[in-house]
Amino acid sequence: MSRTRYDWSKLCHDILRLILESLHYKDYHRARTVCSNWYTASTTCKRPLYPWRIKFNKISTSLFDPREDKIHEIQHPGIEFSDRNVLASCSNWFLMVDSGLEFYLLNAFTRERINLPSMESSILGKERLEKEVAWKHFIERTDIISTKKQACLWINERTGDYVVAWSIKQHYLFTYKKGDDSWLNLEGTKCVSMALNKDYKLYVYALDNSIKIFDLYGEFPSEIVEENPYRNHPFSFRFVSKPEEHAWKQVVAITNSGEVLMIVSLKGLEDKRLFYIYKMDFGSCNWERVDSLGGEMLIFGHGVTIRAPILDINGLGIKSDSICFRGDDLWPLSQLFIPITQPMCGVFDLATSTITWPKSLDASVLKSFWFVPGHA
């Protein structure tokens, strides 16, 4: 007698939702990648979004869930993280690069890997031709992990579509999306900071203080000019700051409603290290400081705000109207203006202008990052 065979991918969403909501967080993120039906069902699950921390060890990762106060260890056989650097993240995915400019995407939970085209022919061949120097003298390994680079990533985990943007030394800005033959160069755009949203729109804060918007959806990137309300209204911190305030880093960010924000890491009175938020008043076209993120929260440098838990998670400062950051995002303590490596990630409370330092996962800030599982 033959046994009845069931197609688990076709379970009704009500049953799938019950199954998914009963799973541990790590298993939940693996299960939602089984098929498109399971992923769609997972989007209806009532699981809160909040930042985790990840530490890249030699051949493994440590994922810290602040709500459960638990660390999950995941082995990555065949990957040597000491030779690789994290450039950006989106949901469960990280944009990685090695010293040879080989790029790939890595899923923190499933260990799935997506290889991207090498950047060497795009950057380094051009540089050899123009300056007749070996590529290693143009891009050193330290440049890849320094503040001279910017990158962002967006990925649709249901369809597998993704888009990546990467800039180095404020000189080159490249984009690549699934289906492209190679990296594309947005020539003439000197990028200080950038943000990428689900509509394939790339927001670039440029060296001349202007904010440019590029549409990456078509065959080739195109700049949006007429419909860019920020194009002729540059943001300059020195025009909105007080004499005792000095900027360390400035990044652009996009809210869930589509508003553009400028986030500034700075040193204030008595050397207090702060974060300020600015948005443009469309009536006056002036940039004005605001005191909150409208109940959302932000990981500094990630480019997009996220829905946030209203109440503090386990006293770690993770809540609405807070900014998660890494130690090198803060104004450096050194009088020599050299960033001092902080041994941990922190959280800045916009309401009180105070910093909470969660317990450290490791002494190496260069291998420890914030990310938001399930947020894309």
UniProtKB/Swiss-Prot annotation:
InterPro entries: F-box-like_dom_sf (IPR036047), F-box_BR-signaling (IPR050942), F-box_dom (IPR001810), KIB1-4_b-propeller (IPR005174). Disulfide bonds: none annotated. Residues 6-53 form the F-box domain. The lineage of its organism: Eukaryota, Viridiplantae, Streptophyta, Embryophyta, Tracheophyta. This is Putative F-box protein At2g33200. CDD domains: F-box_SF (cd09917). Signal peptide: none annotated.
